[in-house]
């Protein structure tokens, strides 16, 4: 009886293990790459480039410290973009959990001005602190997120128009510690439509949007808010 009980329990564990492995494999190789259709709203408002949770919304000068991730460690827009920008900027950060859609979409229509890849300073750090804070809604959502300074990223500049004025926006795809690649589907000089897919990041990651601040801009999102790529209006 005892041997039969042990054998039955072992069989249960085997079946459970197979189901767990099958579920993980489906998530990792099928569900993760899902690409639901998106329908950009009418108008010319700047759209979210990513699905996820907004972790910061700031309007600052490029070299001015935007956020403090730890005591004595501050981050500016220039640190995130890895360029020396000028004039006041709007910065919106979006954390993408492993369960969000990971295809990234253009905030506006325009021409690809540049696509630049920057390797990690040493190695990619995990985004566990930010993930936990977004789950618990524990502000500030960016605290202890050293990946903002450290990690690999691809910076795509899109040159378009906003309210009939020229506008260049930067979309920054920041890799997480478990990321297996940042994909870019566009090249410099090509055109992209508002809400169209231009790339993706594999597994958990972050996408930031940087645009020049202009009079009359209205920020439509706040930290902690959920957004959808190609559909949620960030700025009007």
Q: Would you name each region that the model predicts?
A:
Residues 1-236:
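Contiguous, well-folded functional domains in the mature portion of proteins
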